[in-house]
Amino acid sequence: MQYSFRLAELLGHVPDPRKRPGTIKAIVEYTGLDRHQVAALLKNEVKYIPLKALSRLCDFLIEHGHATPDQLPGALFAVEPENFWELLARRKRLEMCVGVRKDDNPDSEVSFVAASDSVLLGELLNGVTTLGGTAKLRKPVEAVSALASEELPQPEHLKQSLVWSPGQADEDEVMRRAKTVHERFSDSKGDKALVGIGSTKSNPVVEIILSRSFNCNAFESQDEVATPNERALPFFLRYRDNDPHPPSCMAGLKLSKSDTGTKEGLYYEDANGKWIRCGSGKSGEEVAFVFYLHRESQGRLEMCMGGFSGKATRLLARALGTRAQDFWPPAYASQGMQIGAFIVEFTMPAGKKETDILRTDLVATAEVTVIPHEAIARRLEKR
């Protein structure tokens, strides 16, 4: 069992170089701790803490109204997840966001969620509440102690958010609504998770999650960078020519300014800086992605996932239900962050049935590629 130090969460501290709230200075002056030690505590990067220092931190939290005496020191520690589903289930507040489309009738108040996104959302709920179907295996036959009878991790609050898919409202309104959802999540207190379902083609909150994760501008294309290695993200969705093409840090029509031959699909950068296309684009092959960033010291998780097509999204839902272990552990762990980024390639068996569009139990061979630590580190550690 592993624990994280949640000082940043109790203080509501977000390490943003553009904002300097004076948190570290205030703690240093009150406790007498070293500035670098406080910074490391806020990032959950300290392996041990003296009892005297822990006592002074508790005094600081009580005096400044961040916690009560009966909550400390326990509130400063949290059990860390040991698999993909625990990563979500251990959050106290879980928010899931999907993109919606309007009815063609301008007077209608009806809006639609893509069937594939609904299937993926349902699988997420199932996995979180049953720990991927393993919850019954973890319950003790007889509760011989209070510890043994401890309840399984599960969110205390579930929330759903709806945003306009690109093209379903004025561009400014699409961005405004997505930013509002993300800001409300960021401003909420306590341990929390936000999951954006779909790609940037259908869910603009996914764009915001990815842009904030890699410190670049949302809703701005990177197709004109000099070389592919200058892209802010280590993976790229090349739109179909007949797709909507909303400006995106993750997606576009070419890897770089000089690129002329990029084919539709998902690409990622390998450990050596080479860009690899996933799948051949042939009939019967589908591709999807999963990304998450966990700031353990803040108790904050942001995640997004989706397929290149509706079928790919439904296949991803099935993969989560049967192979969630392939999305753990995160490939990158540094600077108080854990990041997992994965591309999933599906190969369907030969033959197609007309009812495939309604099936949620599609069978396909799945190959999960982990986007390597080096590709992520090159972008985060040069900031």
Model-predicted segments: where are they?
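DNA-binding alpha-helical recognition surfaces that contact promoter or target DNA
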Residues: 9, 40, 59
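DNA major-groove recognition helix of helix-turn-helix/homeodomain DNA-binding modules
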Residues: 50-71
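Recognition helix of helix-turn-helix/homeodomain-like DNA-binding domains
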Residues: 32-49
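The DNA-recognition helices of helix-turn-helix-type DNA-binding domains
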Residues: 45-46, 64, 79
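Solvent-exposed alpha-helical segments and adjacent loops
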Residues: 82-383
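Residue at a beta-strand N-cap/secondary-structure junction
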Residues: 21, 48-51
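A short, Lys/Arg-rich alpha-helix, primarily the initiator
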Residues: 1-26, 30
